[in-house]
Amino acid sequence: LGPKIYGTPLIIGVNWLTLSIATYGISSYIFRHNTFIILFASIFMVFTDYIIEPLAGVLDFWHWSLDEIPIQNYIAWFFVSLIIQLILVKGNFKFNIKLCCALIFSQILFFIIQYFNYGLF
């Protein structure tokens, strides 16, 4: 997946930014209160990571040293997501809800297909 920083491909950061924007767009469409937008989007990001992580090693995106995903990964991503969502809320950005839904749907669908492809379901 290209150049890496601390063992993680840079494109993963780009993907996380895209997912952050998409989850923010969906959250801000559903909720009006900033706290709910931030919390829902951050939880959605962790849910998405929960889908991606088991396949990361299989797809050779990255590997965990003990071949199991540490809970700290999900906790860290929740807090990273909170910060990203807070920035997006403070910026009062507006994104196309259809595009945001399509981005999330395509990401999740890709990984679900990979689960079937690698016999993990």
For each predicted feature, which ranges?
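Aromatic-rich, lipid-facing transmembrane alpha helices and their immediate juxtamembrane interface loops
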Residues: 1-121
